């Protein structure tokens, strides 16, 4: 009998072809990293944003791959397997959020970040948009990014280490270091261009995997009658409303609000060649996301019948994809599918490393170094950017060396933290002419604080009243919106040229 959640190497003989496939995958990543390094010009914007020269298809898949992470391949199938189709509500919320993001945020952000000081980070954009000469908003938002993304990144290293431990019986720390060395190499040397190309490559692998596994599982089981079998085994798992409430569904939908403020996702919009290419990126990106999420749901559902038929003991449902990929397929294909999991994990790690590095370099080092003759110090800034990648990675690896549940729980709420702190501010910055520095700073801080307070002290009260169990992005987002508006109305309006920039952006986007 197989057991979900224990080392597969103890249950399935690892074939040399599986290892070959993983090694080939790593070699391809290293080659892409070297290519990115060869293309480098020594310019910070080029290292951090690819010189704003990225095409629509790489933009689309790199955004999707860095967004979905291992959650799409491991988390969602495990959730569907355990709780059923009620997990679909979060996928609807995420897809709607991503779709709206392409329409509402992407075009204006791409144009605005270039015409207003050529901002290469989100904090830099806030600073330029609000004419914050004291750099207060830049420092606060940069600090939020550095702290939360360092913690966020460590969870990816933990996932990578556990994958090698589970699939190959390798020591956790050895697996962690293997993932770290590869991802640091291509991010350190290749910068944004290498990260974007590898994310595109990894996005393709992830999509193929999410289509292959549920289809082959259906063919190996009982075809479409498998769903009838599932209904017999776990009838409640096909119920969209099982175990949910109106508040629960709203909470799941609200995940979509976070998209407008996720730095590692919206930076993709800043790097595309032209805002006119965004419709192409949107069509591919949302299609990729929809197919991938449907595939993940398919893995979870077919897994119910598969696990039962094969008499596999379930301890950790999130290893469902790993088990199915290794039992259903030839070792060579199984290795490819394990590479898909690594792709999901590493694409997010690299994106978060680069965003954090960008913030350390652009939002802190350049402030300390001074802006005088900045153009003559580009190679120095690129070097600092590379060293920042290494520094953040070392800190994240150190935290991941001894996984701590408390930290992992905090990382699980980082989406809400970024969404509450940055989403309202991004929307206000792009659409509201009366936004002021004081309003922006107050709303951003209030959103982040509400999320932390809700997680720490209010959410535990859900045992008394279900209302307190709502997803923390909802109160955080609402408070941030209100505080930003009220404080902006009570403080001095921005200068005319700030409003002129906003009008200029509107005009360019409409062209």
UniProtKB/Swiss-Prot annotation:
InterPro entries: Na/Glc_symporter_sf (IPR038377), Na/Pro_symporter (IPR011851), Na/solute_symporter (IPR001734), Sodium:Solute_Symporter (IPR050277)
Protein name stated in the entry: Sodium/proline symporter
Membrane topology annotation: Multi-pass membrane protein
Superkingdom per UniProt: Bacteria
UniProt key word Nucleus: no
Phylogenetic classification of the source organism: Bacteria, Bacillati, Bacillota, Bacilli, Bacillales
Main function: Catalyzes the sodium-dependent uptake of extracellular L-proline.
CDD domains xrefs: SLC5sbd_PutP
Stored NCBIfam families: Na_Pro_sym (TIGR02121), sss (TIGR00813)
Gene Ontology MF terms in the entry: L-proline transmembrane transporter activity; proline:sodium symporter activity; sodium ion binding
Catalysis performed (reactions): L-proline(in) + Na(+)(in) = L-proline(out) + Na(+)(out)
Subcellular location: Cell membrane
Keywords on record: Amino-acid transport, Cell membrane, Ion transport, Membrane, Sodium, Sodium transport, Symport, Transmembrane, Transmembrane helix, Transport
GO biological process: proline transport
Family to which the UniProt record says this protein belongs: Belongs to the sodium:solute symporter (SSF) (TC 2.A.21) family.
